[in-house]
Amino acid sequence: MTFCIISHVDHIQINNQWLAYAPYVREMNLWLKYVDQLIIVAPNQKTEQTAIDLAYDHKDIIFYQVPTFDIKTFRSKIKTIGRLPFIFWQVFRAMQQADHIHLRCPGDIGLIGALIQVVFPKKKKTAKYAGNWDSKANQPWSYRLQKWVLANTFLTHNMQVLVYGEWPNQTKNIKP
């Protein structure tokens, strides 16, 4: 099985190994015991390994690099508009090759993944929403949009969304 991770977590390659934030990689390594090939779509901006980086425990990794982006200033908005076609393409082609799509949310890349996964209704999908799932929480617009897409069973065929805590009035694909 080819497993694809769409994530905003910054990565670094050292000695033919891909490393990222250790708690996140530790969790992913649990999943990777059951996959033949791993595709990662994420930023690769790091220049040095840090004490909190850990390597993925997998031998067959394909990495599609995407740039980080934000929309905090006018200049960054213009840069982001220019980068979006490339990011959308990287996410789309990775999803096309995957048997199972795994989104890491909330985050900018996770939002793009949540939107693109709609065109792959027959693929098995999971999303880990590692933020506050409380619908009453004061959150950025992009986080609320991600939660809406992920909870919408019309848009998320074959997807299970893993969230922290149990919340009232949730759709059947939301799993605490």
What spans do the regions from the language model cover?
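Short, well-ordered alpha-helix to beta-strand connector turns
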Residues: V35, Q97-D99, H157-M159
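Donor nucleotide-sugar binding/catalytic pocket of nucleotide-sugar-dependent glycosyltransferases
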Residues: D134, W141-P176
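A short, histidine- and acid-enriched strand-loop-helix "catalytic/donor-clamping" loop
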Residues: H11-N15, K72-F74, K128-P140
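Short N-terminal targeting/anchoring amphipathic segment
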Residues: V91-I109
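Active-site proximal beta-strand in glycosyltransferases
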Residues: M1-V9, I116-S135, K175-P176
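N-terminal strand-loop element at the rim of the active site
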Residues: Q37-F74
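Short, well-ordered alpha-helical microsegments
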Residues: T47-Q49, I109-G113
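N-terminal subdomain of nucleotide-sugar transferases
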Residues: M1-I52, L155-T156
